[in-house]
C-alpha cells in the first residue's frame, strides 16, 4: 500500500480492500481532500 500526496490530490496504490481501509482511516481525520493535502 502506497500513498502519494501530490500538490492537487492524493494517489493511492494497492489492492482494493487496502485502499478502502486507508480511505476510512483518513476519513476519520480529514473531512475533505483539501485538508489532507494541505497538512504538512
Curated annotation (Swiss-Prot):
Family annotation (InterPro entries): MciZ (IPR025177)
Activity regulation field: Highly effective in inhibiting polymerization at low and intermediate concentrations of GTP and only partially effective at high GTP concentrations.
Annotated keywords: Sporulation
Superkingdom assignment: Bacteria
SS bond list: none
UniProt GO BP: sporulation resulting in formation of a cellular spore
Role description: Blocks Z-ring formation in the mother cell during sporulation by inhibiting the polymerization of FtsZ. Binds to the minus end of FtsZ and functions as a filament-capping protein. At high concentrations, is capable of both capping and sequestration of FtsZ. Decreases the GTPase activity of FtsZ.
Subunit structure: Interacts with FtsZ. Binds to the C-terminal polymerization interface of FtsZ. Binds to FtsZ filaments.
Protein name: Cell division inhibitor MciZ
Lineage: Bacteria, Bacillati, Bacillota, Bacilli, Bacillales
Originating gene: mciZ
Amino acid at each position: 500500500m502506497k500513498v502519494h500526496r501530490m500538490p492537487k490530490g492524493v494517489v493511492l496504490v494497492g489492492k482494493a480492500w487496502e485502499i478502502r481501509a486507508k480511505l476510512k482511516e483518513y476519513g476519520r481525520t480529514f473531512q475533505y481532500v483539501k485538508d489532507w493535502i494541505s497538512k504538512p
